């Protein structure tokens, strides 16, 4: 999907200009066209799935007509489009929609502080009148929930006969903002179009307007999964540095669950979850370490590398032949000796000045040459090399040169490949075999690379036993722990296939921790002091013994507790901050250490899939990937593939379907074959899988032959 084109999603039938301009006095129903515009570079390029735009469409369809009452004769039609974060594209769409007399335009995204957040700058010049009351209402509602709302820049106003409101990009914030403004929108549209009574619900015309509005607002906020609170825990001992638009918890969690049977965490979109994780990576103290070049394969350079000497550092022959003086031209040459690779070529200087002789040609001054091999040093006094194919031996130590030569012909001059002081490798470059050869050529033995993160791996659950346990020693109801060895080997496999992002020496296999609060707490706190990253598996669902999530709310900061994906919905991401004191200087300020905690679901497939999607980008960022390309290399590579199977879609969540892909030389494209049943407990679905199909959240099927994106998790064997 091009980032210069507008993308339309046919959620509803789009009206034509003729329909909008048609006189409808004879019709029973009046049409209100509502435009929903998502501004996002990533969505417009097809590298992210939009959650916000469809959420607005769903709210409008489910709530707006309901607020206007059953007796209302207005037919609400929604049009949904996506444009990149470009002022020109945003303004073009807004202008088009207002010209078509859309009643309401709602934008989502681009209202923050980053350089690409330009929605307010695009909308503001188009407005005839600002509606600051709507802006204030949205800000007040959000500020009552989180102080991070002050980082939002909403704009609302009127252009011609259209009400325009900018909403944040977060699904959660959209529900909050629409919850407060939606009850007033029908009346506002009526006033703009000089029909105040026809669009105002009867209940809202009374003195109970505020009360009824609040009821509608709550209805919107809780319409999906009864979203009670946000992704973040309000922990007084930890600061949440995430600038996303989120709530904090204001109620107590009892470890092990409570009587409440719904999750208190919203479903975070995958892209938003990855963004939160990468932001928290900035809090890790990532130093440079000195690495011997033969051990640096796959690492990322943490500094520019410059040559300390020219290469070559002597004049070298490019070919086998004879070194001559170009001015001597065609003729007979006396062979003075040989210059071979590794030889200094000394004592082979032609005599000066040359004197006439009678040895071969009495008419010419005698000419001299040196036989030379490829890579050998050009002796002083010579400035050209003649290929051996263009010469002839005509006597003992006599050579006939049959062609003329130019100065410098077939000679590598000093520094012609690499001049002294030249930057040969840049900070952020990945070190491969060729880079190691280049470093060795220049005599560079050590390089500085970002220090690889230290990792602790923990499996949780009373039902687990060590994977080495014998069957006859296992009690009924006990299973072997497969997650710890799987994760430990995936860490090594990822480094082998996609670049070094962790070291085997830095992996701490903690083992199995039972479902006991104190055991788990002590282990997490101990690992947080030693490791940059903690990876746990299990204990994040809704069972009364799922202790990991409520415990992390107490000892750390939970940034999100559920992700909108299949498999892996319970994935939780947290940080634990500890302090250390320098024993040599008690007056020195205490140092803070942040540890990233990835709490993966316990089902083996969910564990592996969430590892690839969320842990790997963090590992790659801490390992230096993305330094050179502003983070574009952090996710695993993605390719487009043709399906060889008919695949069932999930209408509730996007799905990551395990498959094997290979290159089809006849079709000239990648093709994918499903690994079969995709149950999250079926580890066989990962057998031979080298990719994850990115399937949309949708009813129905994707037919055989459809083109979809696939995330590579292993090498393509053909």
From Swiss-Prot:
Keyword Transit peptide attached:
no
Q: Spell out the residue ranges making up region: MPT adenylyltransferase.
A: 260-718
Superkingdom, according to UniProt? Eukaryota
Q: Which GO terms describe its biological process?
A: Mo-molybdopterin cofactor biosynthetic process
Q: Where is this region: Disordered?
A: 1-26, 222-266, 344-364
Q: Name one GO cellular component term.
A: plasma membrane
Q: Which SMART domains match?
A: MoCF_biosynth (SM00852)
Q: Which PROSITE patterns match?
A: MOCF_BIOSYNTHESIS_1
- Looking at the record, which segments are called MPT Mo-transferase? 31-176
Q: How does it sit in the membrane?
A: Lipid-anchor
Q: Which reaction(s) does the protein catalyse, per the Swiss-Prot or TrEMBL entry?
A: molybdopterin + ATP + H(+) = adenylyl-molybdopterin + diphosphate; adenylyl-molybdopterin + molybdate = Mo-molybdopterin + AMP + H(+)
Subcellular localization(s) per the UniProt record: Cell membrane; Cytoplasm, Cytosol; Cytoplasm, Cytoskeleton
Alphabetical UniProt keywords? ATP-binding, Cell membrane, Cytoplasm, Cytoskeleton, Lipoprotein, Magnesium, Membrane, Metal-binding, Molybdenum, Molybdenum cofactor biosynthesis, Multifunctional enzyme, Nucleotide-binding, Transferase
Record note on quaternary structure: Homotrimer, homodimer and homooligomer.
This one is known as Gephyrin
Q: What is the lineage of its organism?
A: Eukaryota, Amoebozoa, Evosea, Eumycetozoa, Dictyostelia
